[in-house]
Amino acid sequence: MKKILYSVALAACCMGTMTSCSDFLDASNKSNVTDKQTFATKEGFNSLVNDAYQHLQNVYAAPLFTSCFSAGTDMYADARNKMNEALNTYETLTPENTDIKNLYTYLYAGIRAANSVSYYAQTAQVDDKTKGQLVGEARVLAAYEYYLLVNNFGGVPIMKDFLTTADTGYPKSSAEDVYAYIISELKDVIGKNVLQASTATKGGGRISQETAKAILAKTYLSAAWDLNKQDYFSKAAALADEVIAGRRLTTPFAKLWKADGSGDDNEEFLWDVEYDLATANNTTSGGTEWSSYYCNYLGGNEDNIKATTSSYVPTLYALHCFKKGDQRYDATFMKELPDINKGNAANTGYWTWYKNGESLVGKPVTRYYSAWYETDADFEAWKAIDPANRANTYRIPMDSQSKEAQNMDGRDMEYYDNQQLVYGSSPCKKFDDSQTASNQKNTCYRDIHIITLPEMYLVAAEAYLKAGDNPKALARLNEVHQRAGLPALTGTITIDDILDENACENFGNEARWMDLRRTQTLVTRCTKYNHEMGDKAAQYIGKKLLRPIPQAAIDANDQLTLADQNPGY
């Protein structure tokens, strides 16, 4: 069979959210209407734009996010289930890895969908202002997908236009050329000023001017590291400050991440993959698995639990990043569990905490997961709040020395050994959906936040630090740090300080692997904090500082050869 890159992209498109590619792009579809006729209408053109956005779900609304962006870092560990072992320990990572192939394929499918908007805009019966805005949004979408590609794979083929005929392939462009293309596209769209100023409080699902600037800031930051362009750090800092626009972080962290979704449209969430239970076509299994991430096993479907992936639990490093007084800890982790077995006398379950007003006061508490910094006195003070229901609560410290969690038999147990048991660690509640309160997967209808205002403060902090301006770096970092209820940091900061802050602010929702790759700390941090690798991190990772170009992509592209593969594979 002839090798064509087009066929790979088209196949990926068919796996997306459209009914099928042929229904929309084939001139001989059921209605006998050509693609140009279909997409010339306002409704048809808008369907193209919506489809371009929906391709993001393949990356962010699926387990692909955790395996590609959370595994193999300093923050997450195996539990009863192992995460993707090849991506977590690198030793067996090859170009045949399914998750990496899917990431690559989905991103190019998204680019193709975005490019189709510009192509069909030429004949679309839409007013010029709307057309300019929608084409601008699509161009930024494609630029963002290239940003993800270059940060994971380095140099990749660049497809600037929508393919209407089969093509035998595209050559691999250098990382420098990919960055240059992203920057050029973003600067051009921003300069045209065709986008909405902000969409954060309008749902946050559409690209805006501040979104485009945020992506450009992140692009300059990555390119500065990867291409050794010192002036790009200053550009990244200036753009991040433009996005910040003098805004302070004033909303309490717990309110932002409230499980009922009431914080999802806060101005701090600049860009989202949007979900909405009220308008969902499928309200029982049409959501995402986000509420089940970063949690150990809690029981079977017969129990009053929430579904969990039983993997990606916090490492001891991640837990210790949270200092005493950090308000983000209690908003990130569920510390109290009642009896959640089916038919228990109190008729309680995992979701009782929400149904009882975000508290278990008045309900018997079976397990209490104390933070690493909590003392015996702190535990006794907590029990004294509701002594009748907490007298017999079993305490499981979230520290290196813990207590056996499953049978509550009081045995001392190492933290990582405990993760092989039921109830081994404090469940992550940051992404809970209390509106569905389900024990099934795919029932989270909360928005997925791709870019946030706190992230822009951290981008600015990193960029100013690398540009040699410690006072400004410290000020940007402290805006995030102090919002969490912590005293201001002083003195000279390091990249480790920023990564530690990021771990607390963005536990679970940040592409941690990309952060460590970008900052050239992947090996050192995995050596210190990745329980599965430890001292073998340098050996296992070796030259694998980028993801492998999928073998299927090389086979399907006449202009790629094995010489284009990334080092280490």
How would you name each of these model-derived features?
Residues 148-157, 222-229, 468:
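Short coil/turn linking the two alpha-helices of tandem helical-hairpin repeats
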